[in-house]
Amino acid sequence: MINSKLLFIITHSRGVFFVLNRIKLVSFFGLLLIALLGLDNSVVSFNSNNTVYLEEELNLIWKEQDPAGKEIFVTRMNQRLPEWVNLFKEAASQTDQHWTLLAAISYQESHWDPKAISKTGVRGLMMLTQKTAKEVGITKRTDPKQSVMGGSIYFQSLLERLPESIPRQDKLWMTIAAYNLGFSYLKEARKKTLNANGNANSWNEICNTLILMAKEEDDPSMTTRINEAVGYV
């Protein structure tokens, strides 16, 4: 989970999308997003000199948090990401996300593997369910272009379903969790937080509620899913 104060402002042609604050880096997703921002800001191509420079930057931000995770990410970045960057940028240009956010979600979901499939049946670069694919109008989940565009549209739809009163950054983390877990669980967590006289617009409080929901679950598979979603963000 990420605790916030100012570090990065991601800009988009439509204006500022979200702000990442000065943070204690305890989230792999946070590390991943910052790494991809570094890629966007400092690496214009994927030649060896540029990727070596980025690896040096990663060493500074990753530190001892997850050295194995960093090595896997660097390998995937060199071997897989170049093929899909333009798809992420194309999808980002048609929605309100920055391409690095879409790429970070895709890495967490599939490690940028277009043929990825989970035990629950989600597939593709953005790991969409059949229901979600139908909702966003894609016919082949393992088609990279369809998957990225579908995932981008789905993420934007989740973002827009949340109240405007939620602070922008909290709204972002909630949407990322909902993408992985499902909007119904986020909705239930917000309701439970309100019923406990908490702040349903605070990601930190929603996160704590989700942790309690995981402990109360009778279905071990759902306990795992909720915990994974919390860890995801």
Segments predicted by a language model, with ranges:
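Catalytic and substrate-binding regions of cell-wall glycan-acting enzymes that process beta-1,4-linked
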Residues: V52-K63, W173-V233
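Secretory-pathway/luminal and periplasmic proteins that interact with or process carbohydrate-rich
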Residues: S110-K119, L158-R161, L181-A196
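Substrate-binding/active-site groove segments that recognize
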Residues: K115-T139, Q146-S157
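Aromatic (phenylalanine/tyrosine) cluster motif
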Residues: F8, F17-F18
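N-terminal export signals and maturation junctions of secreted/periplasmic proteins
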Residues: L20-E90, P114
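Intrinsically disordered, low-complexity segments enriched in serine/proline and basic residues
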Residues: I2, L6-F8, H12
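Second-shell loop/turn segments in exported
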Residues: E71-N78, F88-A91, D113-A116, K134-K145, ...
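Short, functionally critical alpha-helical segments immediately adjacent to catalytic or ligand/cofactor-binding
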Residues: K89, Q97-D113, V148-S152, T175-N180
